[in-house]
């Protein structure tokens, strides 16, 4: 019953803001400035049957998710290293702070000096994910019960048993929450990199073309696509992570 109430409340909120959008579009009366949600949906449905739509979606998804995967792997290794070695913690702290504080646009422009536009979204997605998951994994490691760690050392448990009994139950909840945040960030930053780098056949390139041709309907349609891809991949990844957690630990990590 509570789930149904929550669903209807959220659906009602969505309908309310769509109505506000529709009224604003009708009041302005100029599609160049603001298209209605109905027109944006029509434009999106017109894009879907086209082959280049799927090519662009696949091109951008592949590179952004590659950047995310690299961020997951590198941040996990660096977080474990920083927690086990004070010298590594000292060396990595200013780097992570720098990455967090530097604007995405600055990274994109600087990165264009070293990498081609086709690889730019991979690098930028990786850089934006890195400090988020680095902090999340470190938070999880620090939450491990010291008594459990001591017990594992006393009984000389093998590494596989330590991971399942001590480390993963503590790290996975923080890691899951970090991934939820990082996936949204990497999509926004990755598409921003494509808009500036303009690799052919990308979603960012389509957004830029829609902007310079004043095709506001396409601009909103591609924005819908980005939102749907981001939300869809986030739900899929978290579902796979929960399934893996059940297989390894017998339970889903509680965030």
Identify the function of each model-found stretch.
Residues 97-132, 139:
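Generic hydrophobic transmembrane alpha-helix motif, especially the helices
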Residues 123, 127, 160-193, 221, ...:
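Transmembrane alpha-helices
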Residues 178-228:
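Non-cytoplasmic
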Residues 66-96, 109:
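Transmembrane-helix boundary motif in ABC transporter permease subunits
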Residues 27-69:
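Periplasmic/extracellular loop-to-transmembrane helix junction in inner-membrane transport proteins
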Residues 86, 177, 221-255:
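C-terminal transmembrane helix and the adjacent membrane-cytosol boundary/short C-terminal tail
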Residues 5-28:
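N-terminal signal-anchor transmembrane alpha helix
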Residues 136-175, 207:
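Short cytoplasmic-facing helical segments at TM-TM junctions of multi-pass membrane proteins
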């Amino acid at each position: 019953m509570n789930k149904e109430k929550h669903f209807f409340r959220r659906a009602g909120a969505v309908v309310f803001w769509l109505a506000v959008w529709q009224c604003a579009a009708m009041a302005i009366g100029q599609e160049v400035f603001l298209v209605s949600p109905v027109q944006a949906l029509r434009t999106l449905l017109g894009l879907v049957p086209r082959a280049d739509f799927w090519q662009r979606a696949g091109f951008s998804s592949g590179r952004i998710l590659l950047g995310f995967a690299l961020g997951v792997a590198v941040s996990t290794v660096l977080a474990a290293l920083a927690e086990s070695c004070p010298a590594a913690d000292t060396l990595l702290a200013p780097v992570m702070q720098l990455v967090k504080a530097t604007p995405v646009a600055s990274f994109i422009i600087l990165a264009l000096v070293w990498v081609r536009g086709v690889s730019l979204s991979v690098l930028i997605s990786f850089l934006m994910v890195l400090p988020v998951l680095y902090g999340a994994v470190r938070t999880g490691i620090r939450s491990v019960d010291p008594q459990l760690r001591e017990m594992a050392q006393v009984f000389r448990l093998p590494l596989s048993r330590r991971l399942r009994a001590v480390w993963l139950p503590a790290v996975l909840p923080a890691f899951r929450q970090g991934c939820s945040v990082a996936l949204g960030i990497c999509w926004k930053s990755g598409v921003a990199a494509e808009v500036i780098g303009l690799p052919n056949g990308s979603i960012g390139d389509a957004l830029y073309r829609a902007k310079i041709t004043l095709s506001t309907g396409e601009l909103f349609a591609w924005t819908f696509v980005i939102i749907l891809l981001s939300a869809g991949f986030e739900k899929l990844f978290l579902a796979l992570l929960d399934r893996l957690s059940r297989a390894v630990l017998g339970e889903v990590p509680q965030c």
